[in-house]
């Protein structure tokens, strides 16, 4: 090889020359700007780096498994019967197998988010370049999850690339452990699941800060505009384009084309699932009204298609029904897929002319097309929508049954109840069919909101009744009135908001953060979300929402005719209701907790995961609720919260994830921590007494929310406020005083002021506490001391004597 020499050359006379410089050999890395930043002990942790922390919390919060079957079918040695403590051919037992199953769910969810992030980041770098600056609003901590886990403080799109490579590497290593003949211990499968959950929050954060920075989304904006939501907000008389999925990359070109051609008032543009939320965020950074409407969640997909309203459907990725193409083609609705994760067997038309594609789709020669060229898609989708609207009208495409057909369907029901057995929520379909036969639509109108439109009832029906169609036809009146408001996703919580509220959260005077996240698999419709949020907002909790929960919360109105978004401020403060955005914006919720530790407590967060998780568990009153969780992504989001010390409550369907993390409050030794001031042991309250659990009803969950926000660091005012809510919610929803309320009392000033004397009497008579009645003071009885200067920690190394 010849030796390289120095020299010069000129390109001034050359045309069409492009020079690309990647990494310059010997150049000082840009991160040298942060050379003085102190790094924690776990920068870019591997699978085993935080194992000690995981084992620490798993020692208190024990895994509880609820297997769906006793078999393992992973390899050709099997299937193996693991019941009765038997081992499979590879040596694994039922505990280990179920831990492995849960871990697989978690890393599947993490892969979905990081795959989304990789696709989106690649797309945005192609449009804006690696040097495009990151801007998420008023903050010095742009990416708290990224910084906490990797130590990287990203400033440009290019900085996110290496972090995402780290995420992808970790997911690969975790997936390798799933293979037969690898890990065998349940506790280490659990540790790996927790690692996958943590990694998921990094992947989500990358996805959202990239799109916020490039697509003119609101940036930590508490005054983000309101968007229309609901099937009733669509004007069915116009050509209608519906987008389904979670990745907004393809849709932005459609919105731009429609705006450039003056089509905003001529075409209805609506979305389902998180793409809908991100469509409303696009180009609303200046508080411009959204250009799109939100139709609803996954539970509205089949309903929307069966309505016949869409003229064209675009899908991207995640939470999309596998039968969209089949259902849409019945009604002559072309489907365009835009992402390699969902292709439906369609031909790739990315290199074909728009005219040829229009010809094939409008004539019905093809049911749909695969399109990776988003600029071409931007023109194709609106033009196709307008053409298909006319064609479908001319052909008289009929979707829902007529009134006469509806009566015939109801009369054909034999009331075998097979539909109700198949229904995930056991909805009273047979009773509604009887009422419909008598001309009463009200029973089905009630079922419309509760039906998740999974379609299982139709496959169970021996009379082949399209039950979803019956529900929707019977509910046309309520559907037409289904018009709500949802706050456009505001993005992260700003530094000024954290500075203002951090001290109140740690001391307990703001009783806590309640995060309503996750999917739409609710046991009793969307009203449950309204009930939860309204109750906690009235009690001055901070309520943060995202994804499907954020959408469905806007579907219900109170007696005043307003949604909660219209009643409560969108600021991170006591009594605030914040919509952070789509699924990937969940990272901003954990990010806010991390920022509390950094900004209020002045903790170093760079590569310092264990200490911040310890701080969260002991000091920050926060609880997550995934009331309708259904997906693997919901499992990974919740597990990431668990590792960070944030407890999560799932709805009744959450037991199908097959694993919970539940502590035993009566094991007093498990409820001791160190006081970092001197290393001495201190007793703490048994709260939270789970990191992941399920609740059967809203009534059961309500007092759990208040209890889950109690922390050892509460001052007397904070503990009094939290204990008041815990006791009142238990009495309101369960009709009883909580059995363990007295265990959270350290001194008389912890007691609710209005009931202090009555409660002191109960403490004396029923629990044997000694009371000085003259001064109304507790002399003896509490197992914990009130010491607001105490510094509770699970980590011995953080104690001063260490």
UniProtKB/Swiss-Prot annotation:
Protein residues bound to [4Fe-4S] cluster 1: 69, 73
Task: Tell me its EC number(s), please.
Answer: 1.2.7.4
> What does this protein's UniProt record list under function?
Part of the ACDS complex that catalyzes the reversible cleavage of acetyl-CoA, allowing growth on acetate as sole source of carbon and energy. The alpha-epsilon subcomponent functions as a carbon monoxide dehydrogenase.
Q: Which terms under GO biological process does the entry name?
A: acetyl-CoA metabolic process; methanogenesis, from acetate; response to hydrogen peroxide
Q: Which cofactor does it need?
A: [4Fe-4S] cluster; [Ni-4Fe-4S] cluster
InterPro entries in alphabetical order: 4Fe4S_Fe-S-bd, 4Fe4S_Fe_S_CS, CdhA, HCP/CODH, Prismane-like_a/b-sand, Prismane-like_sf
**Alphabetized GO MF terms:** 4 iron, 4 sulfur cluster binding; anaerobic carbon-monoxide dehydrogenase activity; hydroxylamine reductase activity; iron ion binding; nickel cation binding; peroxidase activity
Provide the residue positions that the database annotates as binding [4Fe-4S] cluster 2. 72, 75, 80, 90
Task: Please provide the record's keywords in A-Z order.
Answer: 4Fe-4S, Iron, Iron-sulfur, Metal-binding, Methanogenesis, Nickel, Oxidoreductase, Repeat
Please report the stretch or stretches of sequence annotated as the 4Fe-4S ferredoxin-type domain.
Answer: 404-432, 442-473
> What's the protein here called?
Acetyl-CoA decarbonylase/synthase complex subunit alpha
| Pathway note | One-carbon metabolism; methanogenesis from acetate
């Amino acid at each position: 090889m010849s030796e390289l020499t120095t020299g010069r050359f000129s390109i001034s006379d050359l045309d069409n020359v492009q020079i690309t410089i990647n990494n310059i050999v010997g150049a000082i890395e840009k991160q040298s700007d942060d050379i003085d930043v102190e790094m924690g002990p776990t920068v870019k942790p591997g699978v085993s780096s935080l194992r000690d922390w995981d084992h620490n919390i798993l020692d208190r919060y024990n895994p509880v498994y609820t297997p769906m079957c006793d078999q393992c079918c992973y390899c050709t040695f099997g299937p193996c019967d693991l019941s009765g403590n038997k081992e499979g051919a590879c040596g694994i037992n039922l505990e280990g197998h179920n831990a492995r199953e849960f871990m697989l769910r978690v890393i599947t969810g993490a892969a979905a988010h990081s795959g989304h992030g990789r696709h989106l980041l690649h797309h945005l770098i192609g449009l804006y370049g690696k040097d495009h600056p990151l801007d998420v609003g008023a903050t010095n901590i742009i990416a708290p999850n990224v910084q906490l886990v990797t130590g990287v403080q990203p400033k440009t799109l290019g900085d996110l690339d290496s972090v995402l490579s780290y995420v992808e590497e970790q997911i690969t290593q975790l997936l390798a452990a799933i293979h037969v003949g690898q890990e065998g211990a349940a506790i280490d499968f659990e540790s790996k699941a927790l690692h996958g959950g943590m990694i998921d929050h990094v992947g989500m954060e990358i996805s959202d800060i990239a799109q916020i920075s490039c697509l003119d989304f609101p940036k930590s904006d508490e005054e983000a505009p309101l968007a229309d939501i609901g099937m009733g907000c669509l004007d069915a008389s116009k050509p209608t384009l519906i987008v389904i999925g979670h990745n907004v990359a393809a849709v932005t070109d459609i919105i731009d084309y429609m705006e450039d051609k003056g089509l905003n008032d001529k075409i209805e543009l609506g979305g389902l699932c998180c793409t809908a939320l991100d469509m409303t965020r696009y180009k609303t950074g200046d508080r411009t009204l959204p250009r799109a409407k939100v139709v609803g969640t996954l539970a509205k997909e089949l309903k929307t298609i069966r309505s016949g309203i869409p003229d064209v459907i675009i899908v991207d990725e995640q939470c999309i029904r596998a039968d969209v193409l089949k259902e849409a083609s019945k009604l002559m609705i072309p489907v365009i897929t835009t992402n390699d994760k969902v292709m439906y067997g369609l031909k790739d038309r990315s290199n074909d002319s728009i005219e040829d594609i229009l010809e094939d789709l409008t004539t019905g020669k093809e049911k749909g097309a695969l399109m990776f060229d988003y600029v071409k898609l931007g023109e194709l989708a609106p033009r196709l929508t307008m053409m298909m609207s006319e064609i479908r009208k001319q052909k008289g495409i009929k979707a829902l049954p007529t009134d006469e057909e509806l009566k015939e369907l109801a009369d054909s029901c034999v009331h075998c109840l097979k539909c109700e057995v198949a229904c995930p929520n056991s909805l009273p379909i047979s009773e509604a069919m009887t009422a419909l036969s008598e001309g009463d639509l009200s029973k089905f109108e009630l079922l419309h909101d509760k039906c998740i439109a999974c379609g299982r009832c139709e496959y169970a029906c021996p009379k082949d009744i399209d039950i979803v169609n019956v529900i929707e036809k019977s509910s046309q009146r309520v559907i037409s009135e289904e018009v709500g408001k949802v706050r456009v996703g505001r993005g992260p919580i700003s530094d000024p908001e954290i500075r203002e509220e951090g001290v109140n959260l740690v001391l307990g005077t703001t009783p806590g953060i309640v995060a309503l996240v996750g999917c739409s698999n609710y046991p009793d419709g969307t009203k449950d979300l309204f009930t939860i949020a309204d109750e906690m907002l009235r009690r001055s909790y901070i309520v943060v929402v995202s994804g499907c929960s954020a959408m469905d919360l806007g579907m219900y109105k109170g007696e005043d005719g307003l949604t909660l978004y219209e009643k409560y401020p969108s600021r991170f403060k006591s009594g605030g209701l914040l919509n952070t955005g789509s699924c990937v914006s969940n990272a901003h919720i954990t990010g806010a907790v991390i920022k509390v530790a950094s900004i209020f407590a002045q903790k170093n967060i760079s590569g310092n995961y264990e200490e911040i998780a310890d701080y969260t568990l002991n000091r920050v009153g926060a609880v997550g609720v995934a009331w309708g969780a259904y997906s693997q992504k919901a499992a990974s989001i919740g597990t990431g919260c668990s590792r960070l010390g944030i407890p999560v409550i799932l709805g009744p369907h959450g037991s199908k994830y097959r694993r919970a993390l539940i502590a035993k409050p009566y094991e007093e030794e498990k409820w001791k921590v160190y006081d970092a001031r001197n290393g001495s042991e201190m007793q703490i309250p048994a709260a939270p007494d789970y990191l992941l659990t399920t609740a059967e009803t809203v009534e059961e969950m309500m007092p759990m929310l208040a209890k889950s926000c109690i922390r050892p660091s509460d001052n007397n005012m904070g503990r009094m406020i939290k204990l008041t809510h815990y006791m009142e919610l238990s009495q309101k929803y369960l009709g009883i005083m909580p059995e363990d309320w007295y265990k959270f009392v350290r001194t008389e000033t912890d007691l609710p002021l209005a009931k202090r004397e009555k409660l002191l009497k109960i403490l004396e008579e029923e629990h044997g506490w000694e009371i000085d009645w003259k001064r109304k003071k507790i002399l003896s009885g509490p197992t914990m001391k009130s010491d607001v200067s105490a510094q509770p920690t699970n980590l011995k190394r953080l104690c001063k004597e260490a």
